Amino acid sequence: MYAVAGTWRLDLSMRELQAQALKGIVAGVRQSPGFVRGFWSRDVDEPDVSVTYVVFETREQALAFRSAVEANAPAQADSGVSRTGLRLAEVQADA
């Protein structure tokens, strides 16, 4: 399995819009080919930071998802979200 791990900076003045957008994002990601599991979280120590981790069956599926996320930067910006990191990770173990 492969995961796309992201870190994001959030404009907290747009929190309501981000919460609404997240519902649609999660629903859409669930439909992605090879989707296994996803997590969207907010950093406890830095509330304007979000951490995401989305797992796919294959490297190719994860790469395609990462490309789609990168291409979606304008919509992210419209919601007060800026990407600070986006990594492809090979899952070594799960529990």
Question: What does each model-found stretch correspond to?
Answer:
Residues 2, 9, 37-48, 71-95:
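Glycine-rich beta-strand-turn "strand-cap" elements at beta-sheet edges
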Residues 7-9, 53-55:
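Short hydrophobic/aromatic beta-strand micro-patches
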Residues 9-21:
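Short, surface-exposed ligand-recognition loops at beta-strand->loop->(often short) alpha-helix junctions
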Residues 11-13, 43, 57-59:
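Short coil/turn motifs at secondary-structure junctions
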Residues 13-14, 25, 48, 61:
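Short phosphate-engaging motifs
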Residues 15-17, 61-63, 95:
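Intrinsically disordered, low-complexity acidic/polar segments
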Residues 23-36, 55-88:
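An amphipathic, aromatic/His-enriched active-site/gating alpha helix that lines ligand/cofactor pockets
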